[in-house]
């Protein structure tokens, strides 16, 4: 971006407006059928992240991890453990140890720095910071489990369990069912090697329970709202349309959960800590990370493990230690309704990795320089990686690409809305695609995006359905292949259902150089949209206050005057923050979200009628 544009955006950031100029949004019903979507407005913490003002303890540089842990343990509910400005050299990790309703807050990521030279055991995994519940609860040994005998329809909030002993109102319930043993020819949940997964092991090791030798990767995390006998009211309602008695549906839950814990306003340096995870949320609910600068994590910077309605926002992630496989930014390993919003990812190999998550929103993030040890290979900004992912929304992001791989199995009902995916990074020439949906990635919705790079991409779609099977690395779309770069692999054939169930509408691409409003790209069973009007958002009811005066929406075929050659793209706030924030001598941002974004009430949401412990498995 040119200097004048940078200066303009700098001035915009300094004088952000508090008003909203959003126009009323048309219903998403006009484009995406109700069977293919959910109400994403409920992702994250209902209302907003708590703004706590009472301090229970103030610690200064020189404090040890043990002293920080003691302060957290002694902190009354709803208060803050404050780490004043300076550097804390910690030879062990920080452990919330089952404590709920506490905020760990620094003076700002440019003022308070935690340097880890050790870590903490977090129910069998290692982390720099562990936010966990009080009792071990994982797929190999749930505290409580039962059968689920009735109430399977999409959207229902009433289910019947075999037993409710040990269950109480407010419990976090995990619903699951057996994977499909054969291809259904439609919605397909599978992690079996050669049938749907290319992992070289006999099982792909996607997360989830295994009962009687059958994996259970489809899950949804719900809260218990009421109990009457064995009839249970849940919130939210069921997301997927394929819950059914033939798959032996069941439920499991912990005795406790970590609730409303937050980590704010600090830098975390994981470089020499030896932890697998940076911040690990385990059996957590309504927790958050906000305004954190996270440096050089190992497996991941933030690990959302058996976690629901947790928020990661206004945060800067830099680097991974190995730049290989298992080098992630935010990893949503198992969970529902999490919100990953307005973050910056720089030199992170795989910035957002989706395990078997449902109802999660990944919104308005900026991704740059996906550093990988194979210099010419482009890893993608967002990757759906494990079997059982379904009904997740990816909106307003600016990065290089979106991928649903088949390393660990199948995926269903991803919605990709108003993103810019360039399909390219400097120096990359392999896997340079904007959208990759591999075999058994079905029922995706791709709407209102700007895709590809002018002068580089030459093929619209590489698939058997299109009849074009050349130049795979210069294609906007790569659809249905079981192997990389338009090949078959792992003993698995091409999957024609990826293309035939795909919904595309209003996407601008740099091959045809126009937006595609093509009724032939609307699949059977979904009505062709009546017009070309797109909603501004699928989860926000209007422009959020932290957006300021910048154009809203920022991306789409209906956007004009933007910064890219098509005029259809403006920088989102995370990209603007990246562009204008000074860097140190290593190219790392001198980051503080409070200097970039207006602090304000939460974004308005759409309303809808939808409703020696054994180690946990690795992938």
Regions inferred by a protein language model and the residue ranges of each:
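Repetitive beta-strand solenoid architecture
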Residues: 77, 84, 90, 98-100, ...
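Short glycine/acidic-rich loop motifs that flank beta-strands on beta-rich extracellular proteins
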Residues: 79, 90-93, 109, 113-119, ...
